[in-house]
Amino acid sequence: MTEHFRLSFNARRILATLRARGPRSRAEIARLLDITPSTVTRLTGALIEDGLLGEAADPAREGQKGFPAKLLTIEPGGVITAGVYIDPDRIMTCLSDLAGRVLSEETLPVPDRSFVAMMTVAGDSVSHQVEALGYARRRLAGCGVSYPGQYSEDPTRVMRIRQFKDWPSVNVARDLSPYFGMPVYHMNDAKAACLAELYHGACIGVRNFCHIWLSYGIGGAAVVDQRPYLGRNNGAAEWGGLFPKTQPRPSGQDLLDTLGAAGLPLDKLSDIEDRHLTLPVVAAWRERAAAQLQWLCLVIARTYAPEAIIIGGTLNPLIIEGFLETIRAAPQLGEDYVTTPPRILRAARDNRPQLGAAALPIHQLMNPTAYAGQAVKGL
């Protein structure tokens, strides 16, 4: 993060509160966060000066006598972030603001699947969009980059998926930044997509939820008290490990392999069209995969007990919607599960997975859990 956006712990708490709860007065913020009104006034004054907050009249006090109370609001254009999503089929980039509004975007073909080629295309795309929109560099909080792969014991490295087998051993803290000319933050595709739902999508204000991401593989993420829970080595909620690759599993690659074994070889998930969905082999796969995902939802409900489970990904949308219909229609989530189950939600932002990556710099800026310094009273 640039020096301009090095925010204190309590400044982050103020931004996080306004994001989750909407416009609030200074007095309300002081009560909610248990900090002094003078501290709130000082911190919010600096945030307004930096362009991160704005003020609006309180409609509840309209027409009343005395000095009208002002509500603090997040200023969407105060910060611009870049997002890059890379999968074996395409490269998707965007610029977005604090409200998650996409200001510009591109979807680009994969030139070849080499690391250098894909990152070069992504970096050039981001650079062109920044120049075209004419934003001041001081407003760019950074670029988020996401691509598939489980985390290894080294948190700076993710395991290579089959389609990226020729990539070098990438150090995400070192090897991505040269392509983008700004601070770069990495998270794998599933966990970045979860941030898009947390900050801009179906789970704004949902305190505890889990995310299931269905692409070539099966990924996921967990959010506890509105904060991503990553666990040891960023390995929390990696649901794919519950479905061994030597066995049938509810993944996009498994569907492609199933089609190939039936004499219908397809190279990419984007090659699966609506007309394929009625084929008997696909119908059987969907039925089996839906049962597996219902079992996964039961495991999540028993272990995390979240308010909601959100399902999304890059599989054909009709396949994902079919999974949700099956799980929601089940009389019980599982045997002896007699309490109210978590809500099963459709992801709202998986059509723009690059927006999840663009949320990474916002997370670094706004979320108190990302604060690397020491919390000091009054700051």
Q: Where are each of the predicted segments found?
A:
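ATP-binding/phosphotransfer module of carbohydrate and carboxylate kinases, centering on a glycine-rich
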Residues: 1-59, 64-107, 113-131, 135-136, ...
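Glycine/GP-enriched mid-protein hinge/lid loop-to-helix segment characteristic of carbohydrate kinases
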Residues: 105-107, 114-118, 167-168, 172-190, ...
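Glycine-rich phosphate-binding loop and adjoining helix at the ATP-binding site
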Residues: 29, 102-133, 137-208, 320-333
